[in-house]
Swiss-Prot record:
One of its GO terms (molecular function) is quinone binding. GO terms for biological process: ATP synthesis coupled electron transport; photosynthesis, light reaction. It catalyses: a plastoquinone + NADH + (n+1) H(+)(in) = a plastoquinol + NAD(+) + n H(+)(out); a plastoquinone + NADPH + (n+1) H(+)(in) = a plastoquinol + NADP(+) + n H(+)(out). It is found in: Plastid, Chloroplast thylakoid membrane. The chain crosses the membrane at residues 2-22, 32-52, 61-81. InterPro entries: NADH_UbQ_OxRdtase_chain4L/K, NUOK/Mnh_C1-like. This is NAD(P)H-quinone oxidoreductase subunit 4L, chloroplastic. NDH shuttles electrons from NAD(P)H:plastoquinone, via FMN and iron-sulfur (Fe-S) centers, to quinones in the photosynthetic chain and possibly in a chloroplast respiratory chain. The immediate electron acceptor for the enzyme in this species is believed to be plastoquinone. Couples the redox reaction to proton translocation, and thus conserves the redox energy in a proton gradient.
Amino acid sequence: MMLEHVLVLSAYLFSIGIYGLITSRNMVRALMCLELILNAVNINFVTFSDFFDNRQLKGDIFSIFVIAIAAAEAAIGPAIVSSIYRNRKSTRINQSNLLNK
């Protein structure tokens, strides 16, 4: 694939993730959009590493770190959402002000 095609795909995924993160009212949807953003960043890291830096694997190593962060977010995020749901009976972002009781 050409560099431009991969970058357009990554920009498309990133834009969908940002739009979903800004407009979502549900915490689960916001977590999924955050995963889309992280995957778009991974695509960029691997693409630039492949096209411009064939011998060194800096982009690949960065993408492994981002995958590790995404895995931690995927493990901790739903646990936090389920805890909030048990206490508030809602996963809507605007109804989960935890500072007011």
